[in-house]
């Protein structure tokens, strides 16, 4: 599995989470919400340090990661995190 954070999404996260180079951001599975890959689950986001990262992506010195224990959620899809100007929020695309 691969994870990509595009530049517009990176800038949104930097502003919203007050991120700096060296920070770490976790994408985690949460119950509820809406997803194209796992019904009844969605992704949450938090500043956190990895315990057992399964996938990482670095952008502008910031490490984005998904724990090994959450990889089931992606069902062998790659994750592209982009940004929607209309919604003014990141968009998760499963490829």
Curated annotation (Swiss-Prot):
Quote the disruption phenotype from the UniProt entry.
Knockout mutant does not have growth defects compared to the wild-type when grown with glucose as the main carbon source.
Q: Which InterPro entries match?
A: FeS_biogenesis, HesB-like_dom_sf, PdhI-like
Q: Which domain of life is it from?
A: Bacteria
Q: What does this protein do?
A: Acts as an inhibitor of the pyruvate dehydrogenase. Overexpression does not affect growth with glucose as the main carbon source, but it leads to a dramatic growth defect when cells are grown with pyruvate as the sole carbon source.
The entry assigns this protein to a family as follows:
Belongs to the HesB/IscA family.
Subunit arrangement? Interacts with the E1 module of pyruvate dehydrogenase (PdhA-PdhB).
| Entry protein name | Pyruvate dehydrogenase inhibitor
Whose protein is this, by species?
Answer: Bacillus subtilis (strain 168)
Q: What is the lineage of its organism?
A: Bacteria, Bacillati, Bacillota, Bacilli, Bacillales
């Amino acid at each position: 599995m691969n994870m990509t954070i595009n530049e517009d999404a990176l800038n949104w996260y930097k502003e919203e989470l007050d991120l700096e180079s060296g920070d770490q951001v976790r994408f985690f599975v949460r119950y509820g919400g809406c997803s194209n890959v796992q019904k009844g689950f969605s992704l949450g986001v938090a500043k956190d340090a990895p315990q057992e990262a399964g996938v990482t992506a670095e952008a502008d010195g910031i490490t984005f990661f998904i724990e090994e224990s959450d990889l089931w959620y992606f069902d062998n899809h790659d994750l592209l995190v982009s940004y929607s100007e209309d919604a003014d929020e990141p968009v998760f695309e499963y490829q």
